[in-house]
């Protein structure tokens, strides 16, 4: 969505309308990435989809955080009281990936929570065509669901910040 150099200048959305617009853009991004994930999952090479999902999901989380003004760098630029509000709100909504550097280990931990889906996808690859379609479908819905959950968590954190009165980062 944005290049890394733009990260520090993206602000937390300033109103409920802005949050809704960012939410919808991010949900569209989630759907596009979920379709990519499903396409890779349909390829009958065991393990390829897992590696692809790790990378796609890490990029997705970074992009969503940036769109909401909630990346690690963006939160660091907030005034201390707003930083605290952002992290408390993230903990409150279960947004463990808000304001964090998304690493492979973090993504693996999250994907392990949906481990049964991964096992079903891999087992489905043993059955030609029908298994590939099932694997792609499971991959799409799992990826989309996890992405949507993160979008909603970011939207709630952004709403908390707007309610608290944040509209621009503090400059050093």
Predicted regions: what they are:
Residues 1-40, 54-172:
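Terminal, membrane-proximal amphipathic helices
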Residues 51:
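Ordered, soluble secondary-structure elements with a strong preference for glycine-centered loop motifs
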